Amino acid sequence: MIVGLGTDLVEIARMERLLARHGDRALTRLLHVQERAECPRAPDRAARFLARRFAAKEAAAKALGTGIANGIRFADLQVSHDDRGRPLLNLHGEARQHAQALGATGHHLSISDEQTHALAFVVLESSD
């Protein structure tokens, strides 16, 4: 059964501006420590990377029904990939606790990007 659903669309140029203005401070606030280690250093590639992650985290926060609030931080929502490149969502801290309170036993993440935008879709499901 679906217990949460979220989607988000991010303009990549917005992330370019954010990085130009705030640099590493933005990465520290928005990314999990492992994501920061994976983030490319080239500005255009970093903005695309950040846009995909930001869209995924916003979609996850919407699926949780909280947004980025109530103790849930961007760094609590980590995006990684399996060996085949499938995106994975890892929940930490308050995000994990909130998902458990919803009865979520699994989650699915889809991410896509084109020249100007990144899009993410998250489904939280329970075994009931």
From Swiss-Prot:
Enzyme Commission number(s): 2.7.8.7
Residues given in the record as Mg(2+) binding sites: 8, 58
GO cellular component: cytoplasm
Subcellular location: Cytoplasm
One Pfam family of this chain: ACPS
Primary site of residence: cytoplasm
Protein origin, superkingdom: Bacteria
GO biological process: fatty acid biosynthetic process
Function description: Transfers the 4'-phosphopantetheine moiety from coenzyme A to a Ser of acyl-carrier-protein.
NCBIfam families membership: acpS, pantethn_trn
Family that this chain belongs to: Belongs to the P-Pant transferase superfamily. AcpS family.
Protein name: Holo-[acyl-carrier-protein] synthase
Organism field: Alkalilimnicola ehrlichii (strain ATCC BAA-1101 / DSM 17681 / MLHE-1)
Gene responsible for this protein: acpS
